[in-house]
Amino acid sequence: MESFDNIYLDLSKQPGKCKLAESGLGWKPSGEGETFTLDSSNVGAAQWSRAAKGFELKILSRSSGVIQLDGFDQEDFERLSKAFKIWYGINVESREHALRGWNWGKAEFTKAELSFNVQNRPAFEVPYSEISNTNLAGKNEVAVELALNTDGADANAQPAGSTKNRGRKAASGPDELVEMRFYIPGTVMKTEKGIKEENGKEENGEEEEEGEEQNAANLFYEMLMEKAEIGDVAGDTFATFLDVLHLTPRGRFDIDMYESSFRLRGKTYDYKIQYSSIKKFFLLPKNDDTHTLIVLGLDPPLRQGQTRYPFLVMQLKLDEEISLELNMTDELMETRYKDKLEPRYEEPIHQVVTKIFRGLSGKKVIMPSKDFVSHHGHSGVKCSIKANEGLLYFLDKSLIFVPKPATYIQVENIAIITMSRVGGAVSASRTFDITVSLKAGMGEHQFSNINREEQQPLEEFFKAKNIRFKNEMSDDAGALLAAALDNDVMGSSDDEGVRADRGSADEDEESIDEDFQAESESDVAEEYDSAHESSGSGSDAEMNDASDGGGDDDDDDEDVDMSEEERPKKKSKVGK
């Protein structure tokens, strides 16, 4: 038996003792933690190289991924290589890392990791178990997202890199790499890079005759998806929903539902999300009575480059029905998902998506509070955060604004809500703002342009939930009335002033012009008609099309129709 002290397993924070025997090897931490063991039959290959804490022994196991043992002395190489040769029948390969610092080289897909080589020497390796997602960021660019450590308690409870974690380096530090990008220009033969490594030499020879040229970045992306098990796994998809509209992130995605995760497949980006990342699950009806929103609160948030999306917002039609049969065995349905899922669904799509997400994730569905109904009988209130228009929903224990920027506020964190108007114009009386101030100096959120008719329903909801609120609008009533009266007085005085300045023009207005013919219009009349038409309903129609509700702008539409009816018909000029 060979024993080595002060050895670190898979970047663990504490050292331990490593022992080698004929039956296998083991590592035991010096403090608390579980002992890691590896059977001799599971040792596939071994590599020796310089590392962070001295020299490292990397073991490529047959079924447990990559195992890294760091902290050896240079003199330990002879003992290790002799033990591996005698007990496991394996030669320990001594490898030197590339130290030139070049950022170009060759990517090699091995059994358990992606290796980036410079001049045939490894610069760095990325285990497939550390890769959470990959996307084509451009024509010749591939983005690789690395898995994040989200549960520090579990990381400290288990030895880093144990087989329970599938080789994950759970004991990561506060700073860690989350994304890297590869620029891969040109084209390659598919058989040279993909099929050869996957199916071996015999099948590769057959494929070479039918080989076709393919974009190198696309082939790299497909290989990485397959190696890291990010893409489709045959037979594992329980259900698939096609072309689902997502408001955040914006686009249409196909949703593939798996046992422990779901995948969003879009034209540009693909996402793989664990059900354990779903912290909140909302079902929110829109005010148009034709759509509903399904909102998933994610932690860690979804990442798209430097942009993070803590909420996933999808929009579904209420009247769209589907028939779906789950791709699941009866045994699995009875043992694990009994009373959670049904073998077959035939109902509106938003209900099917909700039930399957709830059954697979185990999360409770949160719906709008019964204590709040808007003036128009809806669950949401139309408002804005800065320039972004959306809907604010009032739930039993929280408030949520969707779709962008999705904002979630817990009722228990609210210190006071202030209802106020902005500005002194008469138009301000039609809308008001609410400012939600949070406790312990956590900041505030302002929601603007709320319809004046929603004041009473909001006050009743705040009283029902014992939320402190302050109404500052009553203090502004006198100022608004004075402003309105001033506007009327100024308007009338202006009219009198204009009439006084016109002089004899008033007499011309009342007298009959004998030269005027009713059948013809002057150039001046056409000019004024043209100006009137350009300032008409064009902008209003665009605003109505852009609005979500649609029903709140009926008055504007009526005004537009009336103005069009009263407008005289223009007659074209005829040259003499």
Curated annotation (Swiss-Prot):
One of its GO terms (molecular function) is DNA binding. It is found in: Nucleus; Chromosome. Residues 153-172, 193-213, 490-576 are annotated as: Disordered. Pfam families: PH1_SSRP1-like (PF21103), POB3_N (PF17292), Rttp106-like_middle (PF08512), SSrecog (PF03531). GO terms for biological process: DNA repair; DNA replication-dependent chromatin assembly; DNA-templated DNA replication; nucleosome organization; pericentric heterochromatin formation; positive regulation of RNA polymerase II transcription preinitiation complex assembly; silent mating-type cassette heterochromatin formation; subtelomeric heterochromatin formation. Residues 204-213, 506-528, 542-564 have a biased composition (Acidic residues). InterPro entries: PH-like_dom_sf (IPR011993), RTT106/SPT16-like_middle_dom (IPR013719), RTT106/SSRP1_HistChap/FACT (IPR050454), SSRP1-like_PH1 (IPR048993), SSRP1/POB3 (IPR000969), SSRP1/POB3_N (IPR035417), SSRP1_DD (IPR024954), SSRP1_sf (IPR038167). Belongs to the SSRP1 family. Forms a stable heterodimer with spt16. The spt16-pob3 dimer weakly associates with multiple molecules of nhp6 to form the FACT complex. Component of the FACT complex, a general chromatin factor that acts to reorganize nucleosomes. The FACT complex is involved in multiple processes that require DNA as a template such as mRNA elongation, DNA replication and DNA repair. During transcription elongation the FACT complex acts as a histone chaperone that both destabilizes and restores nucleosomal structure. This is FACT complex subunit pob3. It comes from Aspergillus oryzae (strain ATCC 42149 / RIB 40) (Yellow koji mold). The gene is pob3.
